[in-house]
């Protein structure tokens, strides 16, 4: 089966855009999806967000790419078929799929609704599925997914602006909840104002926190405070501004994926403050231990969220009208979008209009 052409592996014909090599250039690909199983939902993909992880993966920057690679793990659509044992979805329902499509369902993490930390977690693309075949993501016309790994999208949510919540949204929501930074009146710092950072500001404000954005870019102050609603803004390269913010934060969500010093940020925390890393720098960061000891501070990491938590996040976002700030693009613009993403030239997430612009050839 490994030698079969992608379009012949499974019975359902599918079409998407794939990278063939480390250039990361995406182009049309005919492939196939499995038949709808007893516990599967099949859905037509309407929108798919473009995540920075997609860019890393298609260029094999993490060394784990398998080609052809169809990326995309911020996927929303409408159900077209359900298996005979599916209980939670019906044809016509709006659904979303995030970063994973499988897990062992029996380990301690899975039993605690933390499928995202299962050692056998199956990623939405670039992973080996239970049947030994390669998983393909949402830059495609249809998806087939086990119902456990789909979330329901409430009717009042705009599907295009909801897609990025399935990765960026839950990536910041999960640590805010787990580390109890979701309590009204706390003071939260958000490092970096990009796809993840702007979502952290929105969720933080919805939780009732005071939010300070910390950025290297002074020109983002107006955006952070006046448009996104942050309470204050600190330029991390300005020693006086950093000094005035020392010891003021209950928690920090660090969304930056570039190498950067941790020491100045740890200094912003109050005693027993918590700093959670959600960005993925490509080089190791230097960890100064003494500041952790001095204030009994916590430095932790967090990666996406479990399925129960992802549904909770979507429902919370629906209730508080939280959505991603997006630029909708056609499928044939995706390579240009990747180039712009590499330069940080997007506010704040590209979303592909799959349903209206993916043309089978």
UniProtKB/Swiss-Prot annotation:
Cofactor: Zn(2+)
Superkingdom per UniProt: Eukaryota
Positions that bind Zn(2+) 2: 104, 107, 110, 118
UniProt keyword Nucleotide-binding, yes or no: no
UniProt KW keywords: Metal-binding, NAD, Oxidoreductase, Zinc
Lineage, highest ranks first: Eukaryota, Viridiplantae, Streptophyta, Embryophyta, Tracheophyta
Reactions mediated catalytically: D-mannitol + NAD(+) = D-mannose + NADH + H(+)
Name the UniProt record assigns to this protein: Probable mannitol dehydrogenase
Pfam family name, one: ADH_N
Keyword Metal-binding in annotation: yes
GO molecular function: mannitol dehydrogenase activity; zinc ion binding
EC numbers for this chain: 1.1.1.255
Function description: Oxidizes mannitol to mannose. Provides the initial step by which translocated mannitol is committed to central metabolism and, by regulating mannitol pool size, is important in regulating salt tolerance at the cellular level.
Cofactor note: Binds 2 Zn(2+) ions per subunit.
Family: Belongs to the zinc-containing alcohol dehydrogenase family.
Gene3D superfamilies (alphabetical): Medium-chain alcohol dehydrogenases, catalytic domain, NAD(P)-binding Rossmann-like Domain
PROSITE patterns in the cross-refs: ADH_ZINC
InterPro entries: ADH-like_C, ADH-like_N, ADH_Zn_CS, CAD-like, GroES-like_sf, NAD(P)-bd_dom_sf, PKS_ER
